[in-house]
């Protein structure tokens, strides 16, 4: 454990950020998984709706600094490609 006051504060901040990032990433995975399940089932209407929801979640994660913008763009592109194949 750190003895320096600023480092003790930093440890708390890092832990709070880690938990927030973990929650955001978990919700992203859930949103993308729901889209994939709808796409696998062949439900085009539901897949398109879930694609939009997951896309918004990815954009929010980028704005919070949880994931890189290129990673979000790559995932959104893959979802769009999958939705267009239905």
Swiss-Prot record:
**Source organism's superkingdom?**
Bacteria
Offer an example of a GO molecular function term for this protein: small ribosomal subunit rRNA binding
The record's listing under InterPro entries reads: Ribosomal_bS20 (IPR002583), Ribosomal_bS20_sf (IPR036510)
Alphabetical keyword list: Ribonucleoprotein, Ribosomal protein, RNA-binding, rRNA-binding
Q: Which family does it belong to?
A: Belongs to the bacterial ribosomal protein bS20 family.
Which HAMAP family does the protein's record reference?
A: Ribosomal_bS20
Kindly provide the name given to this protein in its UniProt entry: Small ribosomal subunit protein bS20
Q: Which organism is it from?
A: Saccharopolyspora erythraea (strain ATCC 11635 / DSM 40517 / JCM 4748 / NBRC 13426 / NCIMB 8594 / NRRL 2338)
Tell me the name of the encoding gene. Answer: rpsT
């Amino acid at each position: 454990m750190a003895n320096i006051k600023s480092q003790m504060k930093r440890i708390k901040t890092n832990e709070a950020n880690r938990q927030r990032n973990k929650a955001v990433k978990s919700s992203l995975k859930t949103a993308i998984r729901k889209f994939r399940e709808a796409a696998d089932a062949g439900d085009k209407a539901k897949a398109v709706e879930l694609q939009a929801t997951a896309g918004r979640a990815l954009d929010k994660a980028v704005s919070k600094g949880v994931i890189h913008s290129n990673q979000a763009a790559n995932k959104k592109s893959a979802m769009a490609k999958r939705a267009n194949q239905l």
